[in-house]
């Protein structure tokens, strides 16, 4: 097997390198120790190299840059057996000099052996040709010019222009070059000097023509210059005129006004105005409101004398007024505003040329037309106020009723000086051909009493308006006729009456009283509105007004019935600012126990939709009829327990700052949203309140004093069974957060009623509510004692029997006539002013027993209370804070100050065991914020005391 030779014997890398060397200059070393340089052209299968332009490298030609023709060979082939090695140069190796910006002669000639060499001085002469240009010719004697090489160096490094031309001439190539270069930069001029002079004269005439200049400015207008209100084009023209003062044409251009600049100094955008249509040749020109000049016939008005140039200031002011009128009329109706068309046409007209002089008789005849135009212009300037045209013509309506001068600017109208001639409105129609026409229009117009005051002014065209329309017509026009359209100008009626609404408001708004001027508007409740004067009809109940304060929240509901013989004073509404402002208000269908002639008939309570009313404040709301602010109400349904079956009205529930603890069952406190509990509790406005009133003594009866000693024995007998019944009703489990469950333990003997318990309820301990035991009198701030054996006697047998007899389950609690004893109690103790509890304060459970009148409460009179100290009353607010901290209570009623209430508290405190109650005098921490409590052992129980509340206060007060 033979070994492969040639290219197949080469590996891939060598083959790739050989392929890359094709076309490059390579150097080959042969076996005879010679070196050849040339371009590699091809490689054969036997690995033979074919080269072109081959040069043998010797020591003599090694450093030569160029090869001579004699040294080069076109093609040579080198066999593989003759090649020792081959290589090609990828990058030329250049001589590296020192890299420096500053190079000295030694660095340039570093390799030159200059040592020992003498330098020779060179002196150039004129014969060398140095210092001149290449085109310089040498003048030879005899006047002949001979081209010579200006740069005639011995080394022959360049050619002169003449040498090149001479060489071309030897080759029969003649150059057409001319030194003036006319055939390369200019064209041949056609025409003579006379033709050029005539063209310049025509150009000056065109430039002097105002129409041509106007069109040129319209085409070449600069939008940026129009936006600039400071730069004027005439400034540029004046600057150009200063440079060319010798030209009379430019001086005349300075005297003329620039048509692109308005008389008020602001540039005019003619492009937008010209695009609306070329109206310069349409219609006839008007002599009035000449803004940018008159027609060609009126150009003679402008003279060049000094007097008229000085009078241009006044003419400029007139142009400014015309500009303002034109601007006012642009946005208005252009269909029947003939003056606006004339103004717009004149705006596009060019300025007159002062240089153009009349050349024929037509220009002379136009002078008279100019004078007539000037007179018409003065007339139009006098009637400049008629330019205020409106877009639409008003309809024919009834004339306004002349009204007196009320003194207000609206009724007086504009000053008479602003009302121009012909713009004042006439109250009477102008004389017409048909005298009945004006009367017919008056009859067609509405003549109601309400619309007469607000009827717009009738538009009447008078003689001045007709004269104005005649003036708006062009003076030079003979075909145009007077405008007969109904378009009129705006006129202000000085005699127009004051504006009044056509329809009166459906619900008149009550005026705010002086003392409540900072309070929101209030409306009386329907129950407070008094009916017609006269005695009440039989069967109508008398509802004593309700004291709207939170102090009597836990009291039982009471109701008074007015006898037939009693008279009632009519009237209702806002409480007056005196001691007894509110009288009895009759209201039909009020739930509750009633005694009287109409008690046998069941009262029907009509279910009405709940209405939100802002009621006036009462005496319980604070002094000076102030409302409480910061209270937010939400509608909460609450059912009144004392109505007939299935006739339960829905009312709105009320919430107060704190949960006042009474002897009635209290519902769970309502957690109010966003109520500022930490803020000082002052006089705020109440919102969404139900009507709150209180009852005052009947007419002709004296006021009962607050403290009058112990009640009579007969009254005590009536009060004791009622108290037991009331205590039994309150013994149900409390839902207040301060309440605590019953704790078993030893306790004292409780008094037992001889009758059966009502509604099957057991007699519960009266100490279920822990916060009740801590309540004391707001006058003294100390506990009121009672004798240890102060147990009320049992009620009379008649009353016990009355309590045991229950009505049917579905019958109303007040069916039938009241017992004789109740009638006798009401007649004897009619002076005991009782308080009615509102429906929102009644406990939500419906009992089936008779609600006995509790004649143990005193009238809700505003007593002057003593200042309340810190931690005096453990009243808890809705958010768990102490409501008595900073809460002004002077002037508020407190049901705990009544003597009978103190006796009930004393009895409960004696019966309640110490293990099942809060510590005496606020020492307990259950359900009360401990921040306002005082630490310390509880004080010993006070000795039993007897007597009136005032005697107990003196006995308990420290010496």
From Swiss-Prot:
UniProt feature, compositional bias: Pro residues: 789-798
Keyword Cytoplasm included in the entry's annotation: yes
Keyword Cell cycle: yes
Composition-biased stretches (Polar residues): 341-356, 473-484, 726-742, 756-765, 912-922, 948-959
A GO BP entry: establishment of mitotic spindle localization
Disordered: region residues: 203-378, 392-484, 501-528, 697-831, 867-959
Tissue-specific expression: Expressed in the central nervous system, dorsal and ventral nerve cord, intestinal lining and body-wall muscle. Expressed in the gonad.
Sm domain mapped to chain residues: 13-92
GO cellular-component term (any): nucleus
Comp. bias regions, Basic and acidic residues: 226-235, 270-281
UniProt biased composition (Low complexity): 246-260, 282-313, 504-528, 697-707, 715-725, 766-788, 822-831, 867-876, 902-911, 923-935
Gene Ontology molecular-function annotations: mRNA binding
Annotated family: Belongs to the ataxin-2 family.
Subunit structure: Interacts (via C-terminus) with szy-20 (via C-terminus); the interaction is RNA independent. Interacts with pab-1. Interacts with gdi-1.
Protein name: Ataxin-2 homolog
UniProt organism field: Caenorhabditis elegans
Gene: atx-2
């Amino acid at each position: 097997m033979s070994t492969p030779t040639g290219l197949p014997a080469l590996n891939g890398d060598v083959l790739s390198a050989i392929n890359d060397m094709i076309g490059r200059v390579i150097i080959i070393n042969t076996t005879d120790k010679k070196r050849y340089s040339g371009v590699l052209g091809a490689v054969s299968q036997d690995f033979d190299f074919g080269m072109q332009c081959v040069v043998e490298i010797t020591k003599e030609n090694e450093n030569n840059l160029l090869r001579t023709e004699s040294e080069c060979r076109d093609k040579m082939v080198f066999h593989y057996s003759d090649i020792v090695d081959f290589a090609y140069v990828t990058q030329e190796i250049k001589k590296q000099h020192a890299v420096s910006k500053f190079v000295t002669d030694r660095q340039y000639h570093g390799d030159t052996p200059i040592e020992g060499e003498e330098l020779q001085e060179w002196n150039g002469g004129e014969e060398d040709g140095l210092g001149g240009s290449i085109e310089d010719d040498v003048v030879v004697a005899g006047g002949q010019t001979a081209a010579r090489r200006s740069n005639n160096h011995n080394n022959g490094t360049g050619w002169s222009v003449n040498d090149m031309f001479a060489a071309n001439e030897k080759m029969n190539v003649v150059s057409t070059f001319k030194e003036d270069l006319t055939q390369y930069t200019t064209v041949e001029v056609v025409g003579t000097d006379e033709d050029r002079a005539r063209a310049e004269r025509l150009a000056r005439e065109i430039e002097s023509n105002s129409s041509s200049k106007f069109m040129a400015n319209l085409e070449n207008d600069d939008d940026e210059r129009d936006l600039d209100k400071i730069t004027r084009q005439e400034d540029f023209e004046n600057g150009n005129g200063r440079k060319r003062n010798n030209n009379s044409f430019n001086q005349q251009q300075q005297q003329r006004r620039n048509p692109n600049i308005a008389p008020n100094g602001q540039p005019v955008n003619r492009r937008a105005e010209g695009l609306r249509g070329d109206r310069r040749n349409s219609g006839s020109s008007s002599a009035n409101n000449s803004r940018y000049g008159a027609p060609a016939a009126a150009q003679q008005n402008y003279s060049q004398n000094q007097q008229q140039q000085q009078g241009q200031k006044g003419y400029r002011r007139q142009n400014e007024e015309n500009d303002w009128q034109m601007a006012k009329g642009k946005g208005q109706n252009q269909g029947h505003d003939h003056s606006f068309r004339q103004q717009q046409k004149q705006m596009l007209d060019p300025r007159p040329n002062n240089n153009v002089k009349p050349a024929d008789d037509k220009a002379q005849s136009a002078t008279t037309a100019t004078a007539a135009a000037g007179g018409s212009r003065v007339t139009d300037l006098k009637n400049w106020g008629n330019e205020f045209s409106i877009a639409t013509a008003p309809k024919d309506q009834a004339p306004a009723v002349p009204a007196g001068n009320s003194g207000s600017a609206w009724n007086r109208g504009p000053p008479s000086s602003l009302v121009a001639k012909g713009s004042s409105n006439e109250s009477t129609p102008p004389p017409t051909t048909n005298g009945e026409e004006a009367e017919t229009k008056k009859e067609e117009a509405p003549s109601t009493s309400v619309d007469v005051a607000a009827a717009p002014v009738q538009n009447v065209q008078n003689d001045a308006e007709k004269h104005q329309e005649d003036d708006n017509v062009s003076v030079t026009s003979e075909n145009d006729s007077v405008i007969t359209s109904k378009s009129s100008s705006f006129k202000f009626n000085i005699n127009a009456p004051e504006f009044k609404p056509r329809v009166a408001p459906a619900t008149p708004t009550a005026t705010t009283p002086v003392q409540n001027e900072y309070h929101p508007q209030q409306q009386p409740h329907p129950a407070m509105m008094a009916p017609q004067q006269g005695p009440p009809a039989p069967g109508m109940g008398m509802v004593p007004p309700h004291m709207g304060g939170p102090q009597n929240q836990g009291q039982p509901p009471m109701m008074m019935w007015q006898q037939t013989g009693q008279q009632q004073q009519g009237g209702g509404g806002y409480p007056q600012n005196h001691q007894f402002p509110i009288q009895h208000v009759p209201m039909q269908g009020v739930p509750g126990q009633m005694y009287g002639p109409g008690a046998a008939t069941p009262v029907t309570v009509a279910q009405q939709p709940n209405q939100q009313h802002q009621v006036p404040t009462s005496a319980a709301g604070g002094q000076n009829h102030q409302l409480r602010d910061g209270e937010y109400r939400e509608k909460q349904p609450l059912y009144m327990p004392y109505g007939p079956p299935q006739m339960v009205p829905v009312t709105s529930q009320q919430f107060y700052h704190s949960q006042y603890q009474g002897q009635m069952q209290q519902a769970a406190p309502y957690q109010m949203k966003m109520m500022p509990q930490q803020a000082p509790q002052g006089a705020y406005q109440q919102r969404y309140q139900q009507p709150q009133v209180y009852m005052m003594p009947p007419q002709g009866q004296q006021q009962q004093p607050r403290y009058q000693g112990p009640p009579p024995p007969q009254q005590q007998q009536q009060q004791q069974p009622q108290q037991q019944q009331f205590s039994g009703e309150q013994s149900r489990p409390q839902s207040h957060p301060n309440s605590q469950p019953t704790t078993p333990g030893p306790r004292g003997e409780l008094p037992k009623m001889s009758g059966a318990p009502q509604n099957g309820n057991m007699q519960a301990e009266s100490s279920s509510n822990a916060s009740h035991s801590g309540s004391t009198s707001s006058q003294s701030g100390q506990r009121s004692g009672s004798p240890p054996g102060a147990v009320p006697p049992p009620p009379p047998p008649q009353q016990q029997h009355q309590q045991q007899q229950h009505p049917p389950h579905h019958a109303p609690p007040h069916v039938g006539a009241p017992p004789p004893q109740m009638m006798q109690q009401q007649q004897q103790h009619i002076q005991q002013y009782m308080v009615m509890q509102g429906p929102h304060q009644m406990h939500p459970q419906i009992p089936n027993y008779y609600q006995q009148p509790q004649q143990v409460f005193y009238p809700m009179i505003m007593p002057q209370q003593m200042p309340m100290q810190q931690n005096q009353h453990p009243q808890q607010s809705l958010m768990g804070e102490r409501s008595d901290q900073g809460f002004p209570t002077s002037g508020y009623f407190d049901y705990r100050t009544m003597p009978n209430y103190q006796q009930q508290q004393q009895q409960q405190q004696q019966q309640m065991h110490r293990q099942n109650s809060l510590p005496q005098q606020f020492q307990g921490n259950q359900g009360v914020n401990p921040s306002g409590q005082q630490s310390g052992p509880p004080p010993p129980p006070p000795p039993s005391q007897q007597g009136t509340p005032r005697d107990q206060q003196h006995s308990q007060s420290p010496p």
